[in-house]
Structure formats: structure tokens, C-alpha cells
Amino acid sequence: MILLDTSVLSLAFRRRRGGEPEPQVAAILRRLVAADAPVGVPGIVLQELLSGVRTPQEFDRLTGIMEGFALVLARREDHLTAARIANACARKGIPTSTVDCLIAALAISRQAALFTLDADFARMAAPSGLTLFKISGGGAADW
């Protein structure tokens, strides 16, 4: 499974002005959906995405789009794992946020790769065991 982070969804669904090229992440996301790849969205990411919209129409548009993705909700064990991630990162001097630790925990517990543009997750990967979805570089998960 591939879990989507807010950074990817925000850029992919951002309205573009005429002639503006499609962001690479939007094209990759479209290819993942077309290939019927298992793609999910953490519940907290859905909340973050929808909390940033300005109009009820945009809220409804994004809600409709997001219904096409599996919703990944946190369980008790995910919260415990998130706390362990925060502690492991703190011991290494890596700053984290509670939300980012929960997103990482959800990816780890579902054996999913996290598709993100947020560099904080790259710093968290080694101490947490988080797998990041790669969009270039020749690996098997590349798109």
C-alpha cells in the first residue's frame, strides 16, 4: 500500500491557472490510480487537507475526490507506535510533530510506503523504520 501525505495531496489538487503545467506528483498520483495501485489516506491527512479549503464548494469537490481512496484510521497500537517514533527521534536529536509521528506509525503498521514531499519524514525514516515512496532513482517503487 502507498499512503498519501498532505504535502502530496495539497499540490496534486491545487487549482492551476491556464497553461500552468501539472505538478509531477499529480501525474504520479494519476498513474497510481490508473494502475489500480493500493493507495490510502490517513484520517488525519484527510482532516488536514479539508481544513485548508476556503469554500463549501471546494470542500465538497475534495471530499468527493477523496472518497476514491481507502481511509486509514488510527488504532490504539498506532498511537503507541507514534509515541515510540517520537521518542526514538528525540534521542537522535530529530524534531518531530505529533501528527507526523502518527502518519509514520500508520504507514509502518500497514507496511505501506509514505508518498510525501515533507523532508521531515526523510529525517524520521531511519530511526523509525518508515519506508518512503520513491518517485525517482531506479528503485522498484519508482514511478
Locations of the language-model features?
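Short, well-structured N-terminal submotif of metal-dependent ribonuclease cores
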Residues: 1-41, 51-64, 134-143
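Generic structural signal for small/hydrophobic residues in well-ordered secondary structure
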Residues: 5-6, 49, 82, 107
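A generic structural signal for short hydrophobic patches within well-formed alpha-helices
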Residues: 9, 46-49, 121-122
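Hydrophobic helix-cap positions at the C-terminus of alpha-helices
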Residues: 31-35, 85, 89, 124
